[in-house]
Amino acid sequence: MCIRDSFRRMLLSGLLRSPSQLLMVVAMTLFSYYYCDGDLTTAFTDPKKLIIILIIAGGLFIGQFITMAICPALIKKYDVKKIYNIFSGFSAIPYALMFVVYLIAPTNLADIKWVIVDGILFFAAGAGFGAVNVCQSVMISDCIDYEEYHNGYRPDGVFFSGQSFITKFSAGVASIISGYVYNAVNYSDVNIDAMNNAIANGASFASDFSEYSKAMWFLISIPPAIGMAISVIPTLKYEITRESHDKMLKTLVEKHSQPEQQ
């Protein structure tokens, strides 16, 4: 077995997961238009809007931060591969359900019952996003330990540059997908200005610009759901288990604790 296979699997999984970045790219624009008439700052003067944003956006970020906090404890008890695959695979469900909920009530998602439903879905999606990011860093670190154990050197720079590449690639993929979808519904600078003027004069983003609303709900749900689901495929055969890594790490610690021979 080539030890670098583990890193290749992680790199491929990260690239396949790239569309999940759309949630972070598009969400605040969607929240601004759908819930706050194009101006997110109005949430600070309208209690109803503030509650909606706290539930929806708060759910997204709280879910992310909670899993980032508890993942280190989970990793001590379970294989990081298992945690990564579970969160990646199952978080595809809340992503997809966001669009299903939109299709059920496209103009009524500001009603409190739908706000609560979406808040739960955003919380679950954020939890998956946070857990996967933590696990990815840990798994890359494990790959570095394995490389040192088998080949005698630590390719920290090379391997973590791969993680940076995933981040930049994800941003690029998100831009391409969103650009294609926006172009399909004629969401251009001129039309955005016209929409802003119409909303300022009382138009509704959800009702009067439903094609834009649908495009944004699609972007934050379906491509990320697909990306999270297929990102599990490469890591199903990820070779490093918790037991094997503990064994390798113990050997490396003993090696580094020995005084260098003169």
Predicted segments with their positions:
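Membrane-embedded alpha-helical bundles of multi-pass transporters/translocases
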Residues: R4-Q262
